[in-house]
C-alpha cells in the first residue's frame, strides 16, 4: 500500500506544482443564483441550471411525488425491473422535442456517449471528432476500438479532408461534435457537417447538452439549422432541464439497438423515478412558456455588450486568461467581491487557455451581471 500512496502523492505534487490540482468545495444552493461556501453567500455564475428549473416548485414537487409513488431508486437495470413507467413517458417527450422517432434515456450524459458510441462503431470503423468535443465523446470513442481522428474545431473543410482520406478504408464512419461547446459557448456548423456526412455516408452525432432548453424555443442547437440531418441527437437532463440523466434521440431501429446492446444501459441501474419526473415537469413548463428559453441568452448578451466581447450565441461566455495561475487568481478575487466564477484549467481546456467560464441563467439579475462585467473589466486592466 505504501507504493500506491507514494504514487498518488507524486501525482498530486506534480499537479500542485502546475496549479492544476482540483478540490471539491461543498456548495449549498439557495433561491435564485445565490450559493453558499464556507459560510459565505455569493452570486454563482458557474451553474448549468440555465432556466433555474431545478429550483422551481413544480419540478421539486414532481420529484418528491415520484419518490413517494415509485421509490427513491430504480433498484435494477432497465432490462431487469428498473424500467419504471416514467422512463417511457420521458422518452416519448424527448423524441417529440427533438423531432425523432424514439429516444433512449441513460443514467447521465457521460453514460449516454460512452454507451452509444461503442454500440454503433468498433474495429474497422473510423470516428472523426471535433478537437474541442466533450471528454465523454472521446471516452466513448476510445472504448469503441474504432480508429479515432481529430478534425480542427468547427472546420468543415478539415473534416472533408479527413473524410476523403479515411472513409474509403472504413466500414462505417461516425462524425461527433458538441452542438454547443461547453467551454467556449460557440455552436457547431451542423448544417455543413450534416451535408458532408450525407455526401460521404457518415453518421452525425451531436451532443446538445448545453443547447437543449435554451436555443430554438428549447429544441436545441440542431433546430437552428432546419436543413441539417442529425440522426444521433444526444443530450442531458441535468442542465436546462434541471434534473439528472442523459439521452439519445434517433430512429426506432437505433434506439432499439441501444436498449439491447449499450453496456451503460444494460449493466447500469435505471434512472431514479424522481429524476425522470423532474425532467418531465421541466418539459411541461417549457412547453407552456417557450419564451422562457430565450432569457439565458439575453442575459449572456447583456454581459458581452457591457464587456465589449463578441456577441454571445449561447448562455456560456469564456473569458480566457491564459495561465492556470491567472485564472485561479481572478476567480479568488471575484469570490472576494461576492461572485462565484470557477476557474477552468487544463486538461479541461487546452494549455495556455485557462479561463473564467461564465454561465448565465434566468435567475441572474441584470444589475448583478453588470457588476460582474465591471469587476472583470478591472481585473483585465490590472493584468494588462
Swiss-Prot record:
Instruction: From the UniProt record, list the reaction(s) this protein catalyses.
Output: 6-carboxyhexanoyl-[ACP] + L-alanine + H(+) = (8S)-8-amino-7-oxononanoate + holo-[ACP] + CO2
Which top-level group of life is the source organism from? Bacteria
The intrachain disulfides are none
- What metabolic or biological pathway is this protein involved in? Cofactor biosynthesis; biotin biosynthesis
| GO molecular function terms listed in the Swiss-Prot or TrEMBL record | 8-amino-7-oxononanoate synthase activity; pyridoxal phosphate binding
Residue numbers of N6-(pyridoxal phosphate)lysine PTMs: 239
Which positions bind pyridoxal 5'-phosphate?
109-110, 182, 207-210, 236-239
Q: What protein name applies here?
A: Putative 8-amino-7-oxononanoate synthase
Q: Which organism is it from?
A: Caulobacter vibrioides (strain NA1000 / CB15N) (Caulobacter crescentus)
